[in-house]
């Protein structure tokens, strides 16, 4: 099993898709449970996208973050949805945000609060969704913290999973395993 997908991941690159002719509307959803220390870097990477600003909203779902963090986010061009649950879960936060923001979007993109995205991320995803056969996209996660042995092992594990369980499957025309 692992050998087949490992070898498949080494096959030639997937075909490049032509650029999209229209800009789809994105809701970038960032559930943030006590993520005060990392949320700003994630938000800034979203706001710095090379994509029309009127075609995406960055939605921070603040669950038990500090009032100071919420105040600093409120002055940015983001939609801040504050939630309070007795028992917090990511799915509860996402459902609350979807109810709060409405249906004015073509694509919902979910990021973890410690993710950062490259400046062309939305454009690349928009190009993928221009293909009518594409219904869902799983993007490549890379570790940004490599400063100790455990973090390095986590990064190696992440790359193995990206290669075998996602890229190998995709290059064989199969659905990739979801992560995140």
Residue ranges and their predicted role:
Residues 32-40, 62, 66:
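A structural helix-start
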Residues 44-55:
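Short, acidic, metal-binding catalytic loop of nucleotide-sugar glycosyltransferases
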Residues 40, 66-74, 120:
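Acidic helix N-cap motif at the loop->helix transition within catalytic regions
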Residues 61-70, 85-87, 116:
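A conserved acidic beta->alpha catalytic loop
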Residues 24-27, 57:
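Cell-envelope/extracellular polymer assembly enzymes that use nucleotide-activated donors
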Residues 104-116:
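Short beta-strand-to-loop acidic/aromatic patch adjacent to the donor-nucleotide binding site
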Residues 82-97, 101, 119-180:
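Long helical/loop segments within the catalytic core of UDP-sugar-dependent glycosyltransferases
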Residues 1-22, 73:
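N-terminal membrane-anchoring/stem segments of glycan-assembly enzymes
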